[in-house]
């Protein structure tokens, strides 16, 4: 049911010193976690940044395949706009799968020629092929493994054609995005390291900030 309600939790700090808001998406490979698992993190960000944050409890795979979570995110932005929050004052943020969802939403708005304030991606999932050098080096020695990432992507993917969609495979982006700024954090001993670096390089080469 496309009209089914989804949870969007608001965090309001003791003091707000800007008119922007952050729309946050939690990580967990699109299969795990919720707004509740990331509650402390988002509350901390809100207080330290003195910024209102809305955290979205998007629908998880495998019951909800691509692009269900993206459609939830689009719905959340429409709700914020109905509350007189301009898209140009919205920063999209997320960790891992949440970073992928934030970037996917940026790509969606780029295709609609709609500007957003920024995107802030923490060790984002970017490439469903999972075959970068960092996947080979760090893919079986640390917390997140190459096999786990393949499992997450498999549960998210609906059809083979998804692999040709820039909102599924972020590395297919071939145009300047409409986010004013992009911030990307990578982790050193992480299978996702190289794909996030490559995504950053692609954006830089297309004159993104």
Where are these regions (language model features)?
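Alpha/beta-hydrolase superfamily serine-hydrolase fold, recognizing
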Residues: 2-209
